[in-house]
Amino acid sequence: MVLSQRQRDELNRAIADYLRSNGYEEAYSVFKKEAELDMNEELDIKYAGLLEKKWTSVIRLQKKVMELESKLNEAKEEFTSGGPIGQKRDPKEWIPRPPEKYALSGHRSPVTRVIFHPVFSVMVTASEDATIKVWDYETGDFERTLKGHTDSVQDISFDHSGKLLASCSADMTIKLWDFQGFECLRTMHGHDHNVSSVAIMPNGDHIVSASRDKTIKMWEVQTGYCVKTFTGHREWVRMVRPNQDGTLIASCSNDQTVRVWVVATKECKAELREHEHVVECISWAPESSYSTISDATGSETKRSGKPGPFLLSGSRDKTIKMWDISIGMCLMTLVGHDNWVRGVQFHPGGKFILSCADDKTIRIWDYKNKRCMKTLNAHEHFVTSLDFHKTAPYVVTGSVDQTVKVWECR
């Protein structure tokens, strides 16, 4: 490619500016003489930093080209496999597509949990670096850091309004944050070991937490007092999640079981024992999934007329299981991940399940046909957490590679 005289002149001036501003005086004077440049102040200003700017914009363009090539290849793939690119996909069937929209760095240790805000276009991430970070998922901008924990932050949870954020940590505490003023409202002490999971109950009055001390505790938001303790697990309790109306909570543990508890009485309603290793994660099925689950499992509607509730669990045995809690039965097992399953969630549309694992992938499951329909190589290291936005077409993932990635769905 041949440069015009004007382009050559511009390039020479930009090189001269670069040599001079970086202290290569000798090279600068020789180059200036050989290129026959007469540098004056006005020109100097015009060419200041130009070479670096060109250089970075070339890198940016290369990245964009690679992204577009990747999108084009995906479109070709869908076209040849007769995928739904011609007809418009129903948003209920949108799934995350590579490449990621943003790869965000800022955490200095593995990312442990990622969640979307229920109202605003922000997401929150927790990390082993003892911080919680807030990001705008639409622009990819970092907004702020919440500091207070003194050890790895293990889990975070919003109330339904998004005004309160709960966090828990290996420092054995639970913190409640005002998400409008971004200050810590109170700190709850009571667990005797690493607090691995936290969730604000649907009514917003209570918080549940799970710990390596083998217990689950319920706390009053207003006072910070512990009002209930659920005991029964024989090992570290990894995760606790309330169902939609807050009458039940599910928990999973290193004892390889999933338990479902009745909140009012503290009794264990079900103990589910089919996993063959530590159960890392659980997720309740939204009502939007009930009809697909019934089709998939052929389970007739119960006499009471209402199906479910259903629960997902993901384990270090590399499988995902779906359970019908009303009968305490495993309805299906999804096999495909090559390593520990770390996160599992229903697609808001109800037709798919998303999971992430230590095999560095996100997988999208068409569970009606019990098959993995898409695998995304998501991170450079274990994928620890994922969240699917309830209304906007975004998925967020966090990883041991210390990055957070935002994926657009279409």
From Swiss-Prot:
One Gene Ontology cellular component: COPI vesicle coat
Signal sequence extent: none
Residue ranges of coiled coil: 56-82
Gene3D superfamilies given in the database record: 1.20.960.30, YVTN repeat-like/Quinoprotein amine dehydrogenase
First and last residues of every WD repeat: 106-147, 148-189, 190-229, 232-271, 274-333, 336-377, 379-410
Protein's cellular compartments: Cytoplasm, Cytoskeleton; Cytoplasm, Cytoskeleton, Microtubule organizing center, Centrosome
Keyword Cell cycle: yes
Matching CDD domains: WD40
Gene Ontology molecular-function annotations: dynein complex binding; microtubule plus-end binding; protein heterodimerization activity
Residues in LisH domain copies: 7-39
GO annotation terms (biological process): brain morphogenesis; cell division; endoplasmic reticulum to Golgi vesicle-mediated transport; establishment of mitotic spindle orientation; germ cell development; intra-Golgi vesicle-mediated transport; intracellular protein transport; microtubule organizing center organization
Keywords: Cell cycle, Cell division, Coiled coil, Cytoplasm, Cytoskeleton, Developmental protein, Differentiation, Microtubule, Mitosis, Neurogenesis, Repeat, Transport, WD repeat
Protein task: Regulatory subunit (beta subunit) of the cytosolic type I platelet-activating factor (PAF) acetylhydrolase (PAF-AH (I)), an enzyme that catalyzes the hydrolyze of the acetyl group at the sn-2 position of PAF and its analogs and participates in PAF inactivation. Regulates the PAF-AH (I) activity in a catalytic dimer composition-dependent manner. Positively regulates the activity of the minus-end directed microtubule motor protein dynein. May enhance dynein-mediated microtubule sliding by targeting dynein to the microtubule plus end.
HAMAP family according to UniProt: lis1 (MF_03141)
Record's subunit section: Can self-associate. Component of the cytosolic PAF-AH (I) heterotetrameric enzyme, which is composed of PAFAH1B1 (beta), PAFAH1B2 (alpha2) and PAFAH1B3 (alpha1) subunits. The catalytic activity of the enzyme resides in the alpha1 (PAFAH1B3) and alpha2 (PAFAH1B2) subunits, whereas the beta subunit (PAFAH1B1) has regulatory activity. Trimer formation is not essential for the catalytic activity. Interacts with dynein, dynactin, nde1 and ndel1.
Domain notes: Dimerization mediated by the LisH domain may be required to activate dynein.
Similarity comment: Belongs to the WD repeat LIS1/nudF family.
Protein name, entry field: Lissencephaly-1 homolog
